[in-house]
């Protein structure tokens, strides 16, 4: 993947096999297995909220995404996706886009990000590639 610097994946339930496979393929410095918990929501949701408020996080204008974000509830002082699922025309949703955004922010915080870099070509005397 171009510019891939890291990923956080939900390691609960069905996602555990995918998270484990990603960690094996990309290594622990680029793939993080996350057990979503109240503590994780407490650490990550403020990043999500501030990203939306200061407009550094841009969300697509989509009914499913809007529904996911509207489903957030504050439970014991922590914003989180409620346990019950909602339905849309394609089937069940469970705050998928909220969790995806939060996982992206988790990966950026925990794994860092790749700094953009540039390179300078080196001229090789005597090498003529004009015929290629």
Predicted regions and their residues:
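RNase H-like, metal-dependent nuclease domains and their acidic two-metal-ion catalytic environment used
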Residues: 1-35, 42, 46, 50, ...
């Amino acid at each position: 993947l171009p510019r891939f610097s890291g990923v956080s994946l939900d390691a609960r339930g069905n996602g555990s096999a995918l998270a484990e496979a990603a960690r094996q393929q990309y290594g622990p410095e680029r793939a993080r297995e996350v057990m979503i918990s109240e503590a994780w929501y407490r650490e990550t949701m403020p990043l999500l909220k501030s990203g939306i408020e200061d407009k550094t996080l841009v969300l697509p204008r989509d009914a499913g995404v809007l529904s996911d974000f509207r489903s957030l509830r504050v439970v014991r002082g922590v914003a989180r996706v409620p346990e019950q699922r909602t339905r849309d025309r394609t089937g069940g949703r469970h705050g998928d886009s909220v969790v995806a955004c939060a996982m992206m922010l988790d990966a950026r915080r925990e794994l860092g990000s790749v700094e953009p870099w540039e390179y300078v070509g080196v001229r090789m005397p005597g090498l003529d590639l004009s015929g290629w």
